[in-house]
Amino acid sequence: MVLNLKLGSVLSKGFRKVNVDKPRQIAFEVLTEVMQNGAYSNLLLPQKLSVSGLDTRDKAFATELLYGSIRALGRNDFIARQYSDRNWSDVDPGIVNVIRLGAYQLFDMRVPNHAAVDATVNLARTVLGESKASFVNALMRKLSAKSL
């Protein structure tokens, strides 16, 4: 297996190249800290962004994605529960957080559906692994067919 150590890029025989953009990965990392460890997003996000090397536009995207996902958490969890073929309380917390970010992109941001699904699945592949990314892909496709 050949590893390219750039953020989110993995090259391996038989697998396609996966690129996860830094803003989504930072939003995932902060959301995970908030949901699992009770971290304060308003303290952790600026800290992560200050050392990220992102430009102003990407910082703004990460900020809106994170804070918006937290604001819409109840609604988006409710919708995801309706479309999931698994009991939502049994779903891996990492998957739940990836879906929260993806659902916010679908329902509340100006991200085209296909791009939101693709970026969310790539994020899942990178941070959770291929097997969990399959579930994320299936659920994101169901959610992308839903309109609010």
Predicted regions and their residues:
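Class I Rossmann-like S-adenosyl-L-methionine
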Residues: 2-148
